Amino acid sequence: MKWINSNDDQSNYEDRRGKGVKRGAAIGGVGTIIVLALYLFTGQDFSSVVNVLSGGVTTQTQETSVDDSRAKENEELKVFSLRVFNSANDVWTEIFNEQFQQKYRKPTFVTFTDATTSECGGANSASGPFYCPADEKVYIDLAFFNELSTRFRAPGDLAMAYVIAHEVGHHVQKLLGITDKLDQMRSRLSEEEYNKYSVKLELQADFFAGIWANYAQKLNIIQLENGDIESGT
């Protein structure tokens, strides 16, 4: 995936990396959401998402070298993720203006290490990326992308971009009133019925991620290259 017009704006970015917090429980259903989204996109069976942090190293020299390498990789992932996030906001700003005659309200992009808290509760790396409707923020531990590439066999920029675009898709659902409507229906639905609607909510977020990819190309934000689709399947 090639950037034609990249947006590195950080006005809607919150960096919590390296800021330790008490490890909290993952938001209910978040793991299932990510597993479903990745399954639909890659065709792989992701039955669990595990902690992606690796163990310690044996010497101080090795530790310094590895830490420097990881820090550089982490920063590159931050830049890439922020560009995808900003491009998704640019796309939905255009769509809301042209099709809905509404002003698009941008969410906030939060990167964290190991664990964090949100208005939806606590979460850790094992939760995977998630969107919290209560504070309108997208959360991600960037180490997730290493797991996406190695354990889940979904390498490539497009696979990583899809994950972020999917979470922004949940923000779009919030703005359109879809999320609130489902919450209002919850008390009237059985658990089985509610789960069916939850799956549909995920499918729609997948569809919105596809809209991002399509519009981002039309708006000359990105250009898909040979192998991009294959790398995510």
For each predicted feature, which ranges?
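A Zn2+-metalloprotease active-site environment signal
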Residues: 6-19, 27-233
